[in-house]
Regions:
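Ordered alpha/beta subdomains of enzyme catalytic regions
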Residues: 1-217, 320-424
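Glycine-rich phosphate/ribose-binding loops and adjacent secondary-structure elements
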Residues: 199-352
Length: 424
């Protein structure tokens, strides 16, 4: 049996143990996942990872080997062990659609069900959503900064091997065009790309020999890496070997803007006017913004994408907001939360998002200008997964929803949150 049950913190199970002993584990409850505040400098977040999370919740089961280990390690009592042997999440999960932009306080994911079941999901929910939403927010900002120029995700080598796959998924969700990660291509259907690294060039007696070898296997449409030794000489060698129909060159070092300008002038002077310029090497949304007037044709982004561009977590929390029919909330300084289950709507006026409205779960907002769009979609009902959109469908949704945000909110500069949140 495939299980995700131990992708959790020990205290989730010790809390369950205490709830069972107190007879409270079946108490009807609601948990909400939200951000108390957005990461510094961010004006909106992007909901990501829910498509991965749903099957992980259905796989949150405890086989005999797992339960025996929990008993041997003195994590749970025998009574709790028996509960876990038959465990299957039976509640409801709803929330923002994958790819949906959000602001602080928005109920991204709501989990309803018996208290003991819901409490077990905390670590798994936060692990998936915090990582993927952080990557998605960075990717969305980079995509806006690129202004239509293709973006390649290249961050697998800068993070954990599985996180690299998930980062590629989140990046493609938010508009990236391809990934270097083959597992992401296989698992998620993302276009893959890649040609050669500096090691390939260094393996041959001369740069020209390396280019010729690459052309023999990849064809003239390939991208030649021209900065192993000297960029100008690399470009000249690339055109000499490949001819003026060479697909692209890649520059991975030096001042990006000036390097692209010099490369374009040189390529044009050599007759390679259609050869594209791909820039890589420590790019982020700020550098890409500065390159808006540079003659670059595409960007490859690695480290800054796979680490959330300096914001490696979305800062989401998973809090009990209702139990036994009454709202509950923390009130400690700096972490006071509104209690009660809620749902969200977005007001869109003349094609432009105007505000987020969050109300108690049973209420709908009053009328007003424009369209009131419900933001909550079902993910599981009675423990059974709902039909989920494809990743391509979620990508289309994200691009459409992001395009409705105020234009100044899409700039990389810090500023107020993209939308005001009204709570009632």
């Amino acid at each position: 049996m495939t299980t995700t049950a131990l992708l959790t913190d020990r205290y989730e199970l010790t809390m369950l143990d205490g709830l069972i002993a107190a007879g409270r584990h079946q108490q009807p409850s609601v948990f909400s996942t939200f951000a108390r505040r957005l990461p510094r400098g961010r004006r909106y977040g992007v909901t990501a990872g829910t498509g991965r999370l749903v099957p992980m919740i259905t796989d949150f089961r405890f086989d005999d080997e797992t339960v025996d280990w929990l008993r041997a390690d003195h994590v749970v009592s025998e009574e709790t062990a028996q509960f876990l042997r038959g465990f299957r999440f039976s509640g409801d999960v709803e929330g923002y659609a994958e790819g949906e932009p959000y602001v602080a306080g928005a109920p991204l994911l709501t989990v309803r069900g018996p208290l003991g079941e819901c409490i077990l999901l905390e670590t798994l929910v936060l692990s998936v959503l915090n990582h993927d939403s952080a990557i998605a927010a960075a990717a969305a900002r980079m995509h806006c900064a690129a202004r239509g120029r293709p973006l390649i995700e290249m961050g697998a080598r800068r993070t954990h091997e599985q996180a690299g796959v998930d980062a590629a998924r989140a990046a493609w969700l938010c508009g990236f065009d391809a990934t270097s990660d083959l597992e992401a291509g296989l698992r998620h259907g993302i276009p893959t790309t890649g040609t050669a690294a500096h090691a390939f060039v260094l393996a041959f007696p001369t740069e020209a020999d390396a280019f010729a070898a690459q052309l023999r296997t990849q064809g003239v449409g390939t991208t030649l890496l021209v900065d192993t030794y000297d960029i100008e000489q690399g470009i000249r060698s690339a055109v000499r070997v490949a001819g003026t129909d060479l697909g692209a060159i890649r520059i991975d070092s030096g001042p990006a803007s000036e390097g692209a300008r010099r490369a374009r002038v040189l390529l044009d002077s050599l007759g390679a006017t259609s050869t594209r310029i791909v820039l890589t090497g420590d790019l982020d949304e700020f550098v890409i913004t500065e390159l808006v007037d540079a003659p670059a044709d595409a960007y490859g982004v690695g480290t800054q994408l796979s680490t959330g561009s300096g914001r490696p977590t979305a800062g989401l929390v998973y809090k009990l907001v209702e139990t036994a029919g009454r709202p509950v909330a923390k009130s400690s300084e700096g972490k006071a939360d509104p209690g009660g289950a809620t749902r969200a709507w977005r007001r869109v006026v003349e094609g432009r998002a105007a505000e987020e409205i969050v109300l108690d779960g049973g209420r709908a907002p009053a009328g007003g200008p424009g369209e009131l769009r419900p933001l909550t979609v079902p993910y599981l009902t009675g423990g059974e997964p709902a039909a989920l959109p494809t990743l391509a469908g979620s990508r289309e949704h994200h691009l459409r929803a992001r395009g409705e945000l105020p234009s100044d909110a899409l700039l990389v500069a810090a500023g107020p949150e993209a939308l005001p949140l009204l709570r009632g």
